[in-house]
């Protein structure tokens, strides 16, 4: 059809008129050619007038509407351009260029107006079907799929077109798609390739920094940040981020040095001062750190970050009530009703989490219920409190109600979908829950697969969790979260050797992953195997996060298993200071006292553990019974 219209438009050009001058075909042809000539000469207003006249004379001509759309887009009149491109595609559904232009206009607008994403996807999909080998269309469609939350479809669109491997736009979109769909092993290669294609590309550099941070490879991130700092010496946020990533990567002395230099140069840099405070705290200089954070709060009582940082530092030192008081003071400053409702909700959600950690469950639930779901979305910490209490109190209907509210507020969040399915199964609506988990497990996005595996683990269906995670690892090679879930599920099914192999594979990819070092080291220690190796792992985990109570407990436990009771007491006591309401730490302290023959002290710890909801209360009760003490 398009060829027919083109023929009519150019018919007889330069020859004697075939039709009378008033013939509409002649009028359209002359007006169209006048528009094209004016456009070529840069006379855009004249061209626009002629194109509009041509569209009036030939309202059913797709080429006229398309050319008008192209000019309007060039002139920045995007809304009218989109209308004309859509009209051209409507008149000729096989007009690939019209579909591509309509989709491109929607895609350009979608960054600021997400409501344009679906129409961008629809138009670009039609263009892609009409010209499946067009690399520009494939790259644009992939970008649209990314914006729609379907990175799996984005990658598929790129795979449809051979020869895109060296296309700069495709390299970028491929990296983003693999990252967002959770194909971490492939994404690592993609980001390396993107940056190698042009090391001076700032977008590639900053995107790579964010990617490596998300992978918790802070060493790589710091190297790239330093490269960026060399190019942008006056970029203070880059310097701040170097200090922060050194801290997050366990390089505490370097982080302190960087942060001190920043503070000396710019005392008003609050971010650098917070990082310095955190570096001091993690190196055991908590008094200096607290003093610094309190000074930040005194200087600006309305800074929520300083208040939350101080609160969690105090909580980590076993000072829960003091931590809660810091945040409550901040909330009180916002007034009632609060001057900043969403900020108040966020901080109160943190209070709910601290109350829960202190086992003040009723208070935690009350605040969590008031803050879990708001107009800005879900407060993860509050919702977590409500769901965990629903499990512990065996109130699955409550859990289902809250999970559905969260899923309604954030329909794209797979964790809430998994929670809905979990509580549907708990309430007896098994068919609905099973279907949701099956759909998540089959997803082309790793985060959804992980949500299904996590839900199965919460339901204590460890074999199913392991199977889902194993299938996911095959499809999303190098996804460390799925690998970790696979290892933990295998461990819970008693497959210790298989679990160990998975965790060791993670450590080959990320040798300083503190959580993996802790899990694997504790697993070996608890089973009484490979104790020297377990101790080295746990010492490394503690070196990476010295104030982590769970890591300290694990290190104390492996020392106990090796009969190094002095070191066991040292680390278990530190763990008890950090997490005084932890049942496992109290049980381990009881076992330590029993090994020493101090049965009265052992029973005190075991009884304390029983009040803290241990995973295996019957085992602890048996220890008390066997000791001869009164239950």
Regions found by a protein language model. Name each.
Residues 57, 91, 130, 163-164, ...:
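Structural marker of alpha-solenoid helical repeat scaffolds
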Residues 28, 62-63, 96-97, 135-136, ...:
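Helix-start (N-cap) detector for alpha-helical repeat units in TPR-like alpha-solenoids
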Residues 67, 101, 140, 173, ...:
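Canonical tetratricopeptide repeat
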Residues 588, 595, 599-631:
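Terminal, low-structured helical/coil segments at or just beyond the last alpha-helical repeat
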Residues 20-30, 337-343, 375, 437-441:
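TPR-adjacent "capping" and linker segments in tetratricopeptide-repeat scaffold/adaptor proteins
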């Amino acid at each position: 059809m398009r060829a027919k219209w083109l023929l009519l438009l150019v018919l007889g050009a330069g020859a004697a008129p075939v039709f009378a001058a008033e013939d509409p075909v002649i009028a359209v042809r002359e007006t169209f050619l006048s528009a094209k000539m004016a456009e070529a000469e840069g006379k855009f207003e004249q061209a626009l007038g002629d194109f509009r006249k041509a569209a009036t004379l030939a309202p059913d001509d797709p080429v006229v509407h398309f050319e008008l759309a192209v000019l309007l887009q060039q002139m920045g009149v995007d809304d009218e351009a989109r209308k004309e491109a859509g009209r051209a595609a409507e008149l000729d559904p096989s007009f690939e260029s019209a579909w591509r232009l309509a989709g491109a206009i929607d895609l350009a607008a979608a960054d600021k107006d997400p409501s344009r994403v679906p129409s961008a996807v629809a138009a670009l999909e039609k263009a892609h079907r009409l010209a499946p080998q067009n690399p520009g269309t494939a790259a644009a469609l992939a970008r649209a799929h990314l914006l729609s939350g379907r990175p799996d479809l984005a990658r598929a669109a790129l795979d449809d077109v051979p020869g895109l491997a060296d296309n700069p736009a495709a390299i970028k979109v491929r990296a983003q798609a693999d990252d967002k769909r959770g194909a971490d092993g492939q994404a690592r290669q993609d980001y390396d390739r993107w940056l190698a294609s042009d090391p001076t590309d700032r977008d590639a550099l900053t995107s790579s920094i964010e990617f490596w941070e998300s992978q918790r490879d802070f060493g790589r991130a710091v190297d790239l940040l330093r490269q960026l700092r060399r190019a942008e010496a006056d970029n203070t946020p880059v310097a701040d981020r170097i200090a922060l990533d050194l801290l997050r990567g366990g390089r505490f002395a370097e982080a302190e040095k960087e942060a001190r230099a920043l503070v000396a140069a710019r005392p008003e840099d609050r971010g650098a001062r917070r990082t310095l405070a955190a570096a001091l705290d993690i190196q055991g200089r908590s008094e200096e750190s607290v003093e610094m954070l309190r000074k930040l709060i005194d200087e600006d009582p309305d800074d929520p970050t300083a208040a939350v940082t101080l609160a969690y530092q105090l909580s980590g030192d076993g000072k829960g009530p003091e931590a809660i008081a810091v945040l409550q003071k901040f909330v009180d400053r916002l007034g009632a009703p609060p001057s900043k409702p969403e900020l108040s909700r966020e901080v109160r959600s943190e209070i709910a989490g601290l109350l829960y950690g202190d086992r003040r469950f009723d208070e935690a639930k009350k605040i969590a219920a008031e803050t879990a779901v708001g107009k800005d979305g879900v407060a993860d910490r509050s919702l977590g409190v409500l769901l965990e209490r629903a499990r512990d109190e065996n109130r699955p209907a409550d859990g289902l109600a809250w999970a559905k509210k969260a899923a309604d507020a954030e329909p794209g969040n797979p964790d809430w979908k998994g929670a809905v399915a979990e509580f549907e199964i708990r309430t007896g609506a098994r068919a609905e829950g099973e279907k949701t988990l099956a759909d998540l497990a089959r997803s082309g996005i790793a985060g959804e697969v992980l949500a299904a595996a996590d839900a199965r683990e919460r339901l204590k269906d460890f074999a199913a969790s392991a199977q889902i995670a194993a299938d996911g690892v095959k499809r999303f090679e190098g996804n460390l979260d799925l690998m970790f879930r696979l290892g933990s599920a295998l461990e819970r099914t008693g497959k210790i050797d298989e679990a160990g192999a998975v965790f060791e594979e993670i450590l080959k990819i990320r040798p300083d992953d503190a959580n993996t070092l802790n899990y694997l080291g504790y697993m070996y220690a608890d089973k009484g195997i490979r104790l020297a190796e377990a101790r080295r792992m746990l010492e490394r985990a503690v070196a990476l996060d010295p104030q982590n109570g769970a890591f300290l407990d694990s290190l104390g436990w492996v020392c106990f298993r090796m009969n190094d009771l002095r070191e066991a007491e040292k680390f278990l006591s530190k763990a008890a200071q950090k997490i005084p309401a932890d049942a496992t730490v109290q049980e381990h302290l009881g076992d330590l006292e029993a090994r020493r023959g101090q049965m009265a002290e052992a029973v005190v710890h075991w009884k304390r553990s029983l009040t803290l909801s241990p995973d295996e209360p019957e085992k602890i009760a048996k220890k008390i019974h066997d000791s001869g003490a009164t239950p």
